């Protein structure tokens, strides 16, 4: 069994311009303070204030955005991290685990991973993701690249269509098509941090947001030992070399996860399950009395002293005693949040410690709050009530359908750039305006300079004479469009769609 020594995991070096030499405890903490500054001041964090949590295009400031949600996750992550360190200290294990001088970085990595955990999410959340993946799947037919005869390949892009006698190129074409049809917020977060924003964070800090270990182009069954860790795509083909280096620097096996990412995940689970219900009451989807009844009914069999009684019933009873001086609604959610956090955060911390050998080597194939305990049951209760009574509400569904249409429509609008030949697009990139391509020139001008530069740099590392050059160029061109549209806020995407569709 691998010896647990967090000095081998909390790697304070960076991909570029990394600090050199032996560092003191204070110097290492300053390196992670630099990470905090880079993250908090990044435009990706600022954009979270206009991205959806549950309710798109919400004007009520009391309803959560991705930013306010992420701040709450950050606080819960800090609580769990401190609880882990406190319990290890009580057991006299901080020094044995190499943490005696790394408690500050441990907490900071968790906090900043929590703050960043949603930065890759597109406008309109999961419906934005679905719109991107459906749009590309309807053109690239990724499944056709796996086992159909070449003659039956339905891919509409000539460059990516399988060709007889080109086995090596066909393998790349298949990988590219699968990769582009598996857009995922977590994978986009890795791309943002490394490729688009070039934040040059420490290896440990990036490890904290690598939630899933499955490559986006992976096909076939996943190893049973890593089925949970590979539940979703975690990174793209464009970041493959970077992730390979990250694994080496953090001493992670293939498909393994960085230990502190489990805390980030638990903090997110605890935060959003109560927050979604509170936002639904704020939106008047149901009253607090109706919510209590939904929770009571969904719990099933009740017993004195069970977790429902200690958390939900306790919050309900207390909220009814102060109605003269406080809003019962506010009181209920205050007690519900406090009760939930005070039960689930210590439990998550203990699960982290109890499974530390597997967590440390990155192979623990579960979430911390995913077991057959009452704590997991409470979390599932909140999630199930939200699914049943919030996410399927007509107002929510209508906004999600609108969001799906907006993202699909924007991809349609920018698709002429993907229809250009390699020679035409290269000319457009070099000249920025081509008289014979008036529409495409104007669309290209609208793309963010940051995303255009990322495309130009990626293509500059390719060899134009190589047989695979057209495939890679088209891949990075698609990434350019996905980067631009997924980087929009909900409001910007909505306005852009209406303008370009000449709705106003």
Swiss-Prot record:
Keyword Hydrolase attributed: yes
CDD domains for the chain: HDc (cd00077)
Coiled coil location: none
GO biological process, one term: dGTP catabolic process
Pfam families assigned to the protein according to its UniProt record, in alphabetical order: HD
Swiss-Prot/TrEMBL catalytic activity: dGTP + H2O = 2'-deoxyguanosine + triphosphate + H(+)
Top EC category: hydrolase
Residue stretches spanning the membrane: none
The UniProt record lists the keyword Hydrolase: yes
SMART domains the UniProt entry points to: HDc
Domain HD residue range list: 66-273
Swiss-Prot/TrEMBL cofactor(s): Mg(2+)
Xref: Gene3D superfamilies: Hypothetical protein af1432, putative deoxyguanosinetriphosphate triphosphohydrolase like domain
GO molecular function: dGTPase activity; magnesium ion binding
Entries under InterPro entries matching the protein: dGTP_triP_hydro_central_sf (IPR023293), dGTPase (IPR006261), dGTPase-like (IPR050135), dNTPase_1 (IPR020779), HD/PDEase_dom (IPR003607), HD_domain (IPR006674)
The enzyme's E.C. designation: 3.1.5.1
Family: Belongs to the dGTPase family. Type 1 subfamily.
Subunit structure of this chain's protein: Homotetramer.
Reported function: dGTPase preferentially hydrolyzes dGTP over the other canonical NTPs.
Protein name in UniProt: Deoxyguanosinetriphosphate triphosphohydrolase
Organism: Cronobacter sakazakii (strain ATCC BAA-894) (Enterobacter sakazakii)
The gene coding this protein: dgt
